[in-house]
Amino acid sequence: MPIGGVQSWTATVGRELQRLGHEVAFWGPERPLPAGRFDAGVVANVPHTRAALARCGRVLVVSHGIIPDEGPAGERVAYTSEGVRDRWKGAGPILRQPIDLAFWTQTDAPRRFLTRFSYRRGLDFLPALAKRMGLQFRHVADLPPLDARAALRESAVVLATGRAALEAMACGAPVVICDNRKYQGPLLDPDTLGAMARNYSGRGGVVPTPANVAEAVQRAMGAGSLRSHVEAHHDARAVTQQILEAMAC
């Protein structure tokens, strides 16, 4: 499963809906549409998923980003952050990124790594920065969830954005919001908790350099674990209930 993104969101919410007793069909535009009709549908990326809308009695569109594919459509729309909603000048509810806190957990494993948790490249100064700070460098780019979780549990600090940043927080790792994103280039958001309003994307931040990333890493390690932040704002159980309420189910 890719790091972060719609697939992880869908799997997390779908499992929670199943736990609550709902029958759930998972679908993506690369697959044939399931037969029959559905009481409700939760969809994103409407330019690619529009064919499914007519199969659903009611639809909630979740707008999760700033590019055209991720925009709002239809009558029931929710947004994953204030920044996303402002980008589209929308008025729907905010549904925070849902994280499975029963899976993404912390342990007492030694934390020896400065970890970059992203499928993206760039930020080539990070291995040298980790060495100067007495840490080993690890780039987690394509590990399955169990292996990614093990790596996060061994991380003294994690550089990530979006859902990946939240999964790292849930594993007890200090987090720096930093990545090299396709549409905005390299970004560092020094306000980790304030980044919630910006979907932890790095937007509105500064260009990362060895000096300001080192400062952000030291500050994050001083602040420590942010699991309590994820528990307060991103628990998949609470977010799924909010989804049902937004759909009037």
Where are these regions (language model features)?
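Acidic donor-binding loop of glycosyltransferase active sites
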Residues: 150-166, 173-174
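Short hydrophobic signal-anchor/transmembrane segments that target glycosyltransferases
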Residues: 13-16, 20, 119-136
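Acidic anion/phosphate-binding donor-loop and adjacent secondary structure
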Residues: 69-72, 86-112
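Catalytic binding pocket for nucleotide-activated donors in carbohydrate/polymer assembly enzymes
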Residues: 164-224
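A charged, aromatic-enriched C-terminal amphipathic alpha-helix characteristic of glycosyltransferases
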Residues: 5, 203-248
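Extended catalytic core of nucleotide-activated donor transferases of GT-like folds
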Residues: 14, 25-75, 79-83
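A short, glycine/small-residue-rich beta-strand->loop->alpha-helix junction that serves as a flexible
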Residues: 1-10, 119-121
